[in-house]
UniProtKB/Swiss-Prot annotation:
One of the essential components for the initiation of protein synthesis. Protects formylmethionyl-tRNA from spontaneous hydrolysis and promotes its binding to the 30S ribosomal subunits. Also involved in the hydrolysis of GTP during the formation of the 70S ribosomal complex. Belongs to the TRAFAC class translation factor GTPase superfamily. Classic translation factor GTPase family. IF-2 subfamily. Gene3D superfamilies: P-loop containing nucleotide triphosphate hydrolases, Putative DNA-binding domain, N-terminal subdomain of bacterial translation initiation factor IF2, Translation factors, Translation initiation factor IF- 2, domain 3. The gene is infB. The keyword DNA repair does not apply. Residues 402-406 are annotated as: G2. This is Translation initiation factor IF-2. Keywords: Cytoplasm, GTP-binding, Initiation factor, Nucleotide-binding, Protein biosynthesis. The lineage of its organism: Bacteria, Pseudomonadati, Pseudomonadota, Gammaproteobacteria, Legionellales. The keyword Amino-acid biosynthesis does not apply. Transmembrane segments: none annotated. It comes from Legionella pneumophila (strain Paris).
């Protein structure tokens, strides 16, 4: 082995560097740094020193617990009871337990050669001196090998005597004594068997061995151990031969049979694997912990092989409160596992989803498809009006307030080709709907009014388009107005990194007028040109796959979902799976209201027959059978519920403090019903954003469809406001609302809902009060009155002094008293107020320490109107 540094040698040996340096210095070698080199000669000197010190330590180490014992026994050796010879055995035992900071590796000890025992008369005795070694994490016993020697003849009637001297009586030492006593018996029997010749040992009957019974019962701990009161520790790992030699010599079991007890060889072999020691791991064990999407604290602790209390401690140190049966999410589990030093392995329980992908039939026939174009822009910039002109319809006239509040999907056939348009809302509350529109589209048309320029929703639409990596075509609308300024629009868009082609960019700009039709043909040409560049293709003969654009609950037809088919062909009668919902397609309705039998790629249709309303933005796919659809839907529902529960239970220390302060805040409960899912999400999000630290909006229930009796009951129980957006209450709900005096608010424009709720929250705000100084009087002289006390003769130097107003007395600009103005007189007449420049007498209630030169400040408290 080549020369190594002290640090490398310590790593090879497996001990700390400081300890190795100490050992080198004790061996007479001058080593002070862990980077010094150790050669072969120095290693040999260190090894000889350690061997010598090991032998010295056995005899010179300080004793902690000393055990001495002497016992007498007899063993009959021979063919039978009458012809055999009796050998007297005297056992002397001594054990010393030594405290060690680190247990060195035990040197292998050669087995001593035992001289044969010569058969003697009946009264001959054998003395066995045995020292037993048992190893524990903190205690080590010295070991002396058994020696057999003849001793003088003793009386057979001498009883067994034990002398136990304990220097320290601890529970730890008692356990060691129990194991040591058992090993003494084992060693005794082993020595006797080795001393008996082989020919004689085979002839010994099993019954004669039972005469060692009183030897086995020399200690109460041994008897309790054998009776099962003290259970042995089971070691589940495989032992090497050295460890087995240490714990059981001669291949015999530690546990001896009692008289009359029969055990099979198989059971005896099983007992041989039992050990009494526990070895601490030398290095921390790093485990790979499999983490699903949700897991309980107890299960996570089990996978790390630690107690659940340890996991809870770590979570509390990270600022999260948890219980042993609480479900935590995957993100929290990963942080906890990494904090405890293990390696997290994230697993996705999507075997059902994977099976779904394999079960779906995939087509091979690809054809060109129509582009899906989303019209986006700021509110009132003419998005729907442009679509009206292209479709030659009046969509905008049917929208409440002329504002689009749903995603409209339309398939338009033009002389230049087929195009599918998605019309998104422009209001700030419909951010999620615009994001869904951008994800399902191929091209985005950005409408900007020439007379209004770039607005917040315009910038947001640009961000959505860039996030979805969709090309943008800018349509500058309202060019027929006299104040139209397209150059201004181009300059403002260039700030948002939308550069026109005329300026060297890659974005097409088209000037249009949705009212007169100017530039519409140029816009359609630009759309078709961009679609040719994209080379849009789709599979037409496989299972249909698409996205849910919008969903609503129709009173006569049930759940209705607007689905944009992206690939394959959707047929009437197919089993459609959309998010958590599934069902057989009962009918397909086109955007014109016509019933159709199938829909290909880029075609929007309304689907009837789903089990419930799917969420807007969910993926819709045709599955082979209803059984598979039900399995996947139930799996998704369960996973969503688990994740939602885990997030709800994720309470941090900061969250507890927030909840403590939130109990003082006022809450406005709302029961919300809307006509479509997209509007419901937009309104809920807009109302929730109105919350402040003092007042909060909580949508306790929301749904798609009309207002029912259960909604009214919920509003009564929770003292909530009942809001219907483009829906109405049925007859039963109306009657119940009238009886219970519950007002139902109907709206058709989202602005009105936001304004109304904002006003209600403003009224719930706690009032604020402000002190306004109305007058200041200077004390010129002080008079005594028998009824009132001290009267201050004052001159009003500022404002008005009013009677019964609160006052402050200032001396050298320091407030020395605050009270109420009790008496106000002018020329012996009581007056209500005294204006600036007039003299008056002021009596201060319960205060007589007024002095000339003081200032009396008169103020009043004014309530300030608050706003959100």
């Amino acid at each position: 082995m080549a020369d190594v540094t002290v640090k490398q040698l310590a790593q090879v040996v497996g001990i700390p560097v400081e300890r190795l340096l100490n050992q080198l210095q004790e061996a007479g070698l001058s080593f002070t740094d862990d980077q010094q080199t150790v050669n072969e000669e120095q290693k040999r000197i260190l090894l000889n020193h350690l061997k010598g010190s090991s032998n010295r330590d056995i005899s010179a180490a300080p004793e902690r617990i000393t055990l001495r014992r002497k016992s007498m026994s007899q063993v009959t050796v021979g063919h039978d009871m009458h012809s055999g010879k009796t050998v007297n055995i005297e056992v002397r035992k001594k054990k010393t337990f030594i405290k060690r900071s680190a247990i060195p590796e035990q040197a292998e000890i050669e087995e001593p050669v035992v001289p044969p025992v010569v058969e003697e008369p009946v009264h001959e005795e054998i003395t066995v001196v045995s020292e037993v070694s048992a190893e524990t994490p903190e205690l080590k016993e010295t070991e002396e090998h058994p020696v057999i020697e003849p001793v003088a003849e003793l009386d057979e009637t001498v009883k067994e005597e034990e002398k136990i001297s304990l220097e320290e009586n601890t529970a730890e030492s008692q356990d060691e004594l129990t194991h040591a006593n058992t090993d003494v018996i084992e060693n005794l029997v082993d020595v006797v068997e080795e001393a008996i010749p082989a020919s004689k040992k085979e002839e010994v009957k099993p019954e004669k061995v039972s005469k060692k019974k009183h030897l086995e019962q020399t200690d109460s701990d041994i008897s309790e151990f054998k009776k099962g009161k003290k259970k042995p520790k089971y070691h589940t790992f495989e032992h090497d031969e050295e460890e087995q030699e240490l714990h059981r010599r001669g291949g015999r079991s530690k546990f001896k049979k009692k008289k009359g007890t029969e055990k099979s060889d198989k059971y005896r072999e099983a007992e041989e694997t039992l050990t009494h020691g526990f070895a601490l791991p030398t290095a921390p064990i790093v485990r790979e912990v499999l983490i699903p999407e949700t897991i309980t604290v107890a299960e996570l602790a089990k996978r790390m092989s630690v107690k659940a209390a340890e996991v809870i401690k770590v979570m509390m140190s990270l600022g999260a409160m948890a219980t042993i049966n609480q479900v935590i999410d995957q993100e929290t589990s990963v942080i906890v596992v990494e904090e405890m030093g293990h390696k997290p392995v994230i697993i996705k329980e999507d075997a059902v989803e994977t099976g779904l992908g394999e079960a779906i039939s995939k087509g091979t026939k690809t054809e060109g498809r129509a582009p899906v174009v989303t019209i986006m822009g700021h509110v009132d910039h003419g998005k729907t009006s442009l679509l009206d002109y292209i479709r030659r319809t009046k969509v905008a006239a049917g929208e409440a307030g002329g504002i689009t509040q749903h995603i409209g999907a339309y398939h338009v056939s033009t002389p230049k080709g087929n195009i599918t348009f998605l019309d998104t809302p422009g209001h700030a509350a419909f951010t999620a709907m615009r994001a869904r529109g951008a994800q399902a589209t191929d091209i985005v048309i950005l409408i900007v009014a020439a007379d209004d320029g770039v607005k917040p929703q315009t910038i947001e639409a640009i961000q959505h388009a860039k996030a979805a990596k969709v090309p943008i075509i800018v349509a500058i609308n309202k060019m027929d107005k006299p104040d139209a300024d397209p150059e201004r629009v181009m300059n403002e868009l260039s700030v948002q990194e939308v550069i026109p082609e005329a300026w060297g960019g890659d974005t097409m700009f088209v000037n249009i007028s949705a009212k007169s039709g100017m530039g519409i043909d140029d816009l359609l040409d630009a759309i078709l040109l961009q679609s040719e560049v994209l080379e849009l293709k789709a599979v037409t003969d496989g299972a249909a796959k698409g996205v849910v654009i919008e969903s609503r609950l129709d009173k006569g037809r049930g759940p209705v979902a607007t689905v944009l088919v992206q690939s394959g062909t959707l047929h009437k009668g197919d089993i459609l799976l959309a998010g958590f919902q599934y069902g057989r397609v009962r009918a397909l309705v086109s955007d014109n209201g016509d019933l159709v039998d199938s829909a290909g790629p880029s075609i929007p249709v309304e689907v009837l027959g789903l089990s419930a309303i799917p969420h807007a933005g969910d993926e819709a796919v045709v599955v082979p059978d209803e059984k598979k659809a039900r399995e996947v839907a139930l799996f998704r529902q369960g996973r969503f519920r688990d994740v939602k529960l885990a997030r709800r239970q994720k309470t941090s220390i900061e969250g507890i403090m927030e909840n403590m302060t939130a109990t003082e805040s006022k809450v406005l409960n709302i029961v919300l019903k809307a006509d479509v899912q997209g509007s419901l999400e937009a309104i809920s999000d807009a109302l929730t954003k109105l919350s402040t630290d003092e007042v909060k909006v909580e949508v306790i229930s929301s749904g798609v469809g009309g207002i029912t009796e259960s909604d009214v009951h919920l509003a009564i129980a929770s003292n909530a406001i009942l809001i219907g957006f483009n829906v109405r209450a049925d007859g039963t709900a109306k009657r119940l609302a009238e009886q219970e005096s519950v007002s139902i608010h109907y709206y058709s424009v989202i602005y009105d809902i936001v304004d109304q709720i904002k006003g209600a929250l403003t009224g719930m705000l706690a009032p604020q009060f402000k002190e306004e100084i109305v007058g200041i009087a200077e004390v010129r002289d002080v008079f005594k009155s028998p009824k009132i006390g001290a009267i201050a003769g004052c001159m009003v130097i500022e404002g008005v002094v009013k009677r019964n107003n609160p006052i402050r007395v200032l001396r050298s600009n320091v407030v020395i008293y605050e009270g109420t103005l009790e008496s106000l007189r002018r020329f012996k007449d009581d007056v209500l107020e005294v204006r600036q420049g007039f003299e008056c007498g002021i009596g201060v209630k319960n205060y007589n320490d007024v002095k000339p030169g003081d200032l009396i400040e008169v103020f009043e408290t004014v309530e300030i109107k608050r706003d959100l």
